[in-house]
A protein has these predicted regions:
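Bacterial extracytoplasmic/cell-wall-associated proteins, especially those involved in peptidoglycan
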Residues: 1-159
């Protein structure tokens, strides 16, 4: 398994070395992108949003890290505010720390690794997916809430 991962990473070696991430950090972020992106084509966008949050020392704000931290396998389960605020080195929805969790939460595939090495250059800091998995990016929290409200009005909100 480690040999296969080394083979996968070798094609990105030079670009990983130029990035702001260690291999461990890159795999950690790619593991989150793997679970957060509604469609494979959206992975670069999701990685771009997370990259912006990390660069600006924000909390990563990824729900899938909360599910992982709390050992909840059902992503349709509605997390409570108490669960979202739980301090844990994996829970990036809490305000206990900013940036990446301490390690990967899944085994990222090549597409998620590639998206993390080459994230979309975006000004967005927020994203949400509709019921069909289409991802919508927003630059501000107000825009993000407007997208969510629109999806709810259209019965296309599946959170």
């Amino acid at each position: 398994m480690l040999d296969k991962m080394n083979d996968e990473l070798s094609k990105y070696k030079e670009d990983i070395e130029k990035s702001n991430y260690s291999v461990h950090e890159l795999l950690t972020l790619a593991s989150i992108v793997e679970l957060e992106a509604g469609n494979a084509s959206d992975r670069g966008d999701v990685a771009g949003v997370f990259n912006n949050r990390v660069k600006n020392n924000w909390t990563l704000g990824s729900d899938v890290t909360t599910y992982y931290a709390l050992k909840i396998d059902d992503f349709t389960y509605s997390l409570t505010n108490t669960e979202l605020a739980t301090c844990n080195k994996y829970n990036t929805r809490s305000t206990c720390f900013n940036g990446l969790p301490i390690g990967p939460i899944s085994n990222p595939g090549d597409e998620s690794i590639k998206a993390t090495v080459y994230p979309t250059d975006t000004k967005a800091y927020y994203f949400v997916a509709d019921c069909g998995g289409k991802t919508y990016l927003s630059s501000t929290y107000n825009e993000h809430n407007n997208v969510i409200n629109k999806l709810k009005r259209e019965n296309n909100w599946c959170q």
